[in-house]
């Protein structure tokens, strides 16, 4: 029904105003839901093993498979002055502590000069054929800048340090938290002590649960 002169009645205007209010409320509620959902997801990703990465062949790998074990995460390179000694020491540590409770996880990075120019599969083949590497080598990543690999960014954020060169090493607990990190020049013998202690704790805990 229209009022005289063709203007909308007061009831029509009221309904239009009410509709606008309800629409605004619905939009606000929707925005809040999306924000809450986003925050909820971000809270769930709170440790290293919560992330997914790519292997050398580009396949998605959930780091959850390493939960419950000790991990030594390293940014590796094929053409560095540290390559041979580092790969050999890492392989020895990986073999010594065994894959039941410990793993070296290698992430190639090409942001440090020309020390890593090959493809991920070439890097993997190089490490295996030259140094007998049996630990996993993942897809080549970026560590610095806005395109940094999220899993590796978790490590650097945890220690508030960004690697300045190849072969920085991050020791990750069975729960996915960073225990300590080492610069390239620091001896692997120091890492061995820390990693061995964590592995022993895992074994003791399992024995107590029997």
From Swiss-Prot:
Q: Where in the cell is it found?
A: Membrane
Q: Which keywords has UniProt assigned to this entry?
A: Membrane, Oxidoreductase, Peroxidase, Transmembrane, Transmembrane helix
Q: Which InterPro entries match?
A: Glut_perox_Gpx7, Glutathione_peroxidase, Thioredoxin-like_sf
Q: Which reaction does it catalyse?
A: 2 glutathione + H2O2 = glutathione disulfide + 2 H2O
Q: Which residues cross the membrane?
A: 13-35
Give the principal location in a single coarse category. Answer: membrane
Gene Ontology molecular function terms on file:
glutathione peroxidase activity; peroxidase activity
Return the broad EC class. Answer: oxidoreductase
**Per the UniProt record, which EC number(s) apply here?**
1.11.1.9
Q: Which domain of life is it from?
A: Eukaryota
Q: Topology in the membrane?
A: Single-pass membrane protein
Keyword Cytoplasm in annotation: no
Gene Ontology cellular component annotations, sorted alphabetically: membrane
Protein family (similarity comment)? Belongs to the glutathione peroxidase family.
- Recorded protein name is Probable glutathione peroxidase 8
Q: Which organism is it from?
A: Danio rerio
**Gene that this polypeptide is encoded by:** gpx8
């Amino acid at each position: 029904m229209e009022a005289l002169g063709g203007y909308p009645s007061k009831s029509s205007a009221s309904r239009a105003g009410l509709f606008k209010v309800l629409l605004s409320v619905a939009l606000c509620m929707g925005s809040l839901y999306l924000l809450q959902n986003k925050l909820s997801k971000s809270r769930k990703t709170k440790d290293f093993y919560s992330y997914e990465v790519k292997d050398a062949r580009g396949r998605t790998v959930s780091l959850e498979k390493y939960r419950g074990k000790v991990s030594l995460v390293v940014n590796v390179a094929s053409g560095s002055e540290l390559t041979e000694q580092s790969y050999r020491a890492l392989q020895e540590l990986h073999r010594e502590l065994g894959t039941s409770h410990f793993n070296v996880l290698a992430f190639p990075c090409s942001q440090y000069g020309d020390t890593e120019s090959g493809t991920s599969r070439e890097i993997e083949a190089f490490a295996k054929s030259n140094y007998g590497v049996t630990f996993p080598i993942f897809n080549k990543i970026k560590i610095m800048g806005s395109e940094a690999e999220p899993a590796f960014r978790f490590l650097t954020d945890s220690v508030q340090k960004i690697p300045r060169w190849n072969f920085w090493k991050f020791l990750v607990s069975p729960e996915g938290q960073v225990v300590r990190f080492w610069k390239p020049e620091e001896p692997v013998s120091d890492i061995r002590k820390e990693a061995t202690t964590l592995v022993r704790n895992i074994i003791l805990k399992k024995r107590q649960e029997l």
